[in-house]
Regions:
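N-terminal nicking endonuclease/strand-transfer module with a His-rich metal-binding environment
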Residues: 1-235
């Protein structure tokens, strides 16, 4: 069955994001074959794009620059941690901390190009003001099959003597801030639904509700080897 388009967005965890997306040597040492299936010989098919307009390829530096921008624009420090406040009815309400950098996992086709995903990112920026900072296409992740694939499985292929089912996806890292006001962009449920449709239209895929099991496995893989580290960004 063909993969349907979907994008699932979460607050960015800078430490695990960059290590996973860039396939750093440390990350590859940490993951271990039993915890994540990345096939190194397929990694040459991966592609990446870094937005040149922000002057730094490092998310940590960009995050710090956002904190400074928020302070200059609003006169207040950026609220990074979850906090509590009392509502009008006296009940305690938890308020999430600011998530200035967010990351989307976008399911793609085997022949999806970097240009396709860049077009998606550019359209998101035009419509909602969220700016793509980094884009990574990953075509080296998936899982090994126990034996041969089913007859209807047209995606799995052989690597050596084993059959591999790929999980083609892209990571799109967004700056979620309005740099004129120093405030976070606000997207509602309708906006997010429109984004799903936008992905299917641009990537020429059938629109689908996020296949959460597939998307969650990607997130879990991304943080599994770095679980002991403290995130640099709220998740």
């Amino acid at each position: 069955m063909a993969t349907k388009s979907s994008i699932h967005i979460k607050p960015c965890n800078i430490a695990s994001s960059e290590a996973h997306n860039r396939r750093t040597a440390e990350y590859m040492r940490n993951i271990g074959e039993s915890r994540i299936y990345v096939v190194p010989e397929l990694s040459t098919d991966n592609e990446q794009w870094i937005n040149p307009d922000f002057g730094t390829p490092e998310l940590r530096t960009h995050y710090d620059n956002i904190k400074q921008m928020v302070k200059e624009k609003t006169g207040r420090a950026m609220q990074e941690k979850e906090r509590e406040r009392k509502g009008k009815n006296g009940k305690i309400i938890k308020v999430a901390g600011c998530s200035p950098i967010r990351e989307g996992v976008l399911l793609i086709r085997p022949d999806t190009t970097l240009a396709d995903v860049r077009k998606f990112g550019e359209e998101c920026q035009r419509r909602w003001g969220i700016t793509p900072l980094q884009i990574f296409l990953h075509k080296d992740e998936g899982h090994w099959l126990n034996g041969q694939p089913e007859a209807e499985d047209k995606e799995s292929f052989q690597v050596g003597n084993r059959w591999f089912k790929p999980n083609y996806h892209a990571h799109v890292v967004f700056d979620w801030m309005n740099h004129e006001t120093g405030k976070s962009r606000k997207l509602n449920d309708e906006d997010m639904a429109t984004m799903q449709t936008l992905a299917s239209d641009i990537l020429l895929m059938e629109r689908g509700q996020a296949k959460l099991s597939q998307v969650k496995s990607i997130w879990n893989e991304m943080i599994s080897s770095l679980r002991s580290r403290k995130p640099n960004c709220n998740v």
